[in-house]
Structures are given as structure tokens and as C-alpha cells.
Amino acid sequence: MAEKVQYYMEQSVPELEDLLEKNIFNRDEINNIIKTRRVFEEKLARRQVKLNDFLSYIQYEINLETLRAKRHKRLNITGKITISDYAGPRKVLFLFLRATNKFFGDVTLWLDYIHYAQKIKAVNIVGKICVAALQKHPNNAELWVVACDHEFSINANVSAARALMNRALRLNQENPVIWAAYFRLELSYMTKLFARSQILTGNISSKTENITNGVSEDTIGSLSSDTIQLPMVSMEEFLGSSSSEVRKNDSDLNISDDIGNISSKEQQTQKFANVLLQIILNSRKNLSLQNYVGFFVSVLDALFECFDVPVVQYMYQENIIGICNEHFEHFKNESGEIYGVLLHRWCFLEIFIKLRGAYPSNDSGISGKGIFGLKKNDPRITSMVLTDPGFVDDLQAIVEKYQSISSDFQIPFKTKKIFYSFFVKTLHAISSSSAAESSIALALHMLVINAFQSMEKLKILTFDDSLQEIYKEAQIQSGTFMSNATLS
């Protein structure tokens, strides 16, 4: 044990000498670092080592590196990079490696390892860590999503990201999180291609070019026999023209060419929509009913966010409205939290499309990270929607759907309970916006009160403090508040 401790201590000698030479730490501080590291190394050398020993050591080294970086900046040290400039992060990574070798069953440890490597921009190491983690935990959806997000967002390699998702689905066909991540991956790729095509055709300014920086132009090639078969769509097909045609001026195009291009673009839009539709159909074959509904809620949230893309607009009109109505009739008899969330999305479908997201944004069926996570609601878009004269018609559609749900006795109480909870929170969030006109806000508050009265009548909900506050505020705003009015 002593030899092992001494070996690791000797590895840090060049680093400590460099720190002393640069006057970042004085002699006493160096001695203190040596003593602290020796204590940690002795703990790690024991036969019964604990995970907390590794975590404490890692946190100490991270704090030490943070202090070193601050002093380095304050002293304004210039010159070439020396060993002390990179020894800190390297030591932390090595400690994570030792920890994962010992406690390879801890998924949180692997995720912390990946996140630290991403934080210090060790791109090549992140990929290796993901591979090692997935070898130990092939059935963990979060690790697959993190690995895919790294390939797509950081490495700009959509082919590798797609290969990871297909491999994940082969091993976890019944996991809705991976299906939702796969859908968002394809949708994100299409969104990037759309933004890039807008730049190439001159329809938007170059300010949006950062959206597509580093995006690979690899085509969606044919997949192996054991992967999900999807239609092939390339960048050239998406643009609907060759690169030479893109560079032509508008004056060079005649009317017949324009008509041909429009037809071609419509065909490409249908191809892209078919890719997304196939994912939905395949997921329904592989997932249980409850898992599929959770997946579909996540699909709706993703489509809400990307409604500016023509593919999503086409898919919404041709497929999603019909699927949502069919799901409402087919699943309304099911009891469970996720079915109440689905009713909530169906009820607010028209408004969420315009708001570019479910409202509030934290009300999601399936959570995710990176490109797979939900975006926050944009106050500017909310303001535009609430001041639009058409919002009154959308509100009327919500009222009609709400009434159909309230009066439908086939919907189980448990499902209605979740729906009402989400319903009042959404109305409260929208009515609380500064852009909401007084008449609109009043109508929303009255609708909230009606929902609370329905819940009280059915006795299906025990109100928490947040719902109590919403009910009280709605009564005050509508002029019906009584000081002794409380909810059971």
C-alpha cells in the first residue's frame, strides 16, 4: 500500500515544482497540498475503499485547479504552456478513471465524468468515456442520450449520432426516452438543414448562420438490416436544386422553373415528414401503451418548438391533428398521469403551436438534455400570440375541448385530476403574462375558476399550496374572491 501511495505522490512532483517556480503557491501551501493528497491516496489504497473517498478527492482537485487558474490570471503570467497549466484537469480525469474502474456500476459517476470532460472541452476523451460507460450500462437511456447529443452537437456528426440511436433502440426497444431522443435527433437535423437552406437561398440573413455551423452534409444513407429503415433524404434533396442553381439570381429564373421548384420542394417536405412519421409508427409497435403516450407527448413538445420549419407545418396539418384526435378517442378511457398530460396537450394544441412550446415549459412528458431538452418559453412570442386578434378564436377552441373533457364520464377521475391540474397552471401562466389584455386575462381567470369548481364538485383533487394560490389569485382578478374561501 505504501509503495502505491508513494508512486502516485511522485507523479505530482513536476507539477508542484512548476507551481512553486511560478509563485502561484508558496512553500507552505505546496506542503499542505502534499499532505492533503497523501491523506486521500492512503484512503484510496485501502482494501475497502468508498466512493465518497474518490468524490472528496475529485472535488478537492477541482477546487485546487480553480484556485490555481484564478491566481494565474491575477498574476498575469505569460509565456508558453507548462505542466502546471494542464496537470490539474488531467489529474481530475485520472481520478474519475480510477473511480469508474472501481465503481463502474454507478451511472451518476459516469455522468459526472462525462460532464467534467465536456466542461474542460476534452472532446476526444468524452467519446471514449461514453463508449466505456455504454459497455457497462447498455440499457441506460440517459447515457445513450448524452452520447448522441455529444456526437450531434459537439462533433457535428449526424451519422454517428444516428448510428448510436439505432444501436440504442436495438438494445432498448421498449424505452420511450430513447424513441423520443431519436425523434428529436432527426427533427433537429432537419431544422439545421432548413436554416442552412434559408441562408443558401438568401431568404434570411447570415446572422442565423451560427445555427448551422459545423453541421455535416452527410446524406441520410441506407441503414443496416437490423436498424429502423427510413426514407433517404440528402442536403441536395432538401434544397430541391443543385448548388449551381442556388447561386443563380432570381432574375435568371422564369415562371415555369419556379413552379417546378415549388413542386420539388413539396416532395422533399413530404419525404422529411415521412421520416418523422415512420418513427412514430415504429414506436407504437414496440412500446407499451403507457410508454407510447409518454413518447407521443414528447413528440408534440418537440413539434411545438420547431413549428417554423415547413416540414413540421406540413406534418402538423397532414398527420398530427388527425393522430391527436384519434388518440383522444382511443386513450380517453385509460387511467394514469401521462394520459392526463396527453389530454392537456390536445386541449391546448392550437395555442401551443403558436407559442412554440408547451406552457409552462417545465410541464413535459419525458425530460431530456442537450438538444433533447425542452426550451424555455420565449416572452416575445408569447406577447405576439396574446395580442393577435386570432387568439380569441383559439381560446374558444380550448373552451370547447375543455367542456368536452369535463362532460365526458368515460374519462377516469385519475386522468381528469392530472388534466385539471395542468389546465389551470397553463391558463394561470398565460394570463399572468404582461402582454395579456384585461379582457383576455379576465376570461382566462373565469375559466380557471370554472375548472376549480369542477374539481371540487368531483372531489378528485387535493389542492397543494401552489394550486391554492392560483385559485385565490383567479378569484381576486375576477372579483369573486372571498377571504374565507379555501379549498379542501
UniProtKB/Swiss-Prot annotation:
InterPro entries: HAT, TPR-like_helical_dom_sf, Utp6, UTP6_N. SMART domains: HAT. HAT repeats lie at residues 31-63, 87-119, 121-153, 156-188. Keywords: Nucleus, Repeat, Ribonucleoprotein, Ribosome biogenesis, rRNA processing. The keyword rRNA processing applies. It holds the Pfam family U3_assoc_6. Gene3D superfamilies: Tetratricopeptide repeat domain (1.25.40.10). One of its GO terms (cellular component) is cell division site. One of its GO terms (molecular function) is snoRNA binding. Coiled coil: none annotated. It is found in: Nucleus, Nucleolus. The keyword Ribonucleoprotein applies. GO terms for biological process: maturation of SSU-rRNA from tricistronic rRNA transcript (SSU-rRNA, 5.8S rRNA, LSU-rRNA). Component of the SSU processome, a pre-ribosomal particle required for the maturation of the 18S rRNA from the 35S pre-rRNA precursor. Component of the ribosomal small subunit (SSU) processome, composed of the 35S pre-rRNA precursor, the U3 snoRNA, and at least 40 protein subunits. Interacts with U3 snoRNA. Belongs to the UTP6 family. This is U3 small nucleolar RNA-associated protein 6. It comes from Schizosaccharomyces pombe (strain 972 / ATCC 24843). The gene is utp6.
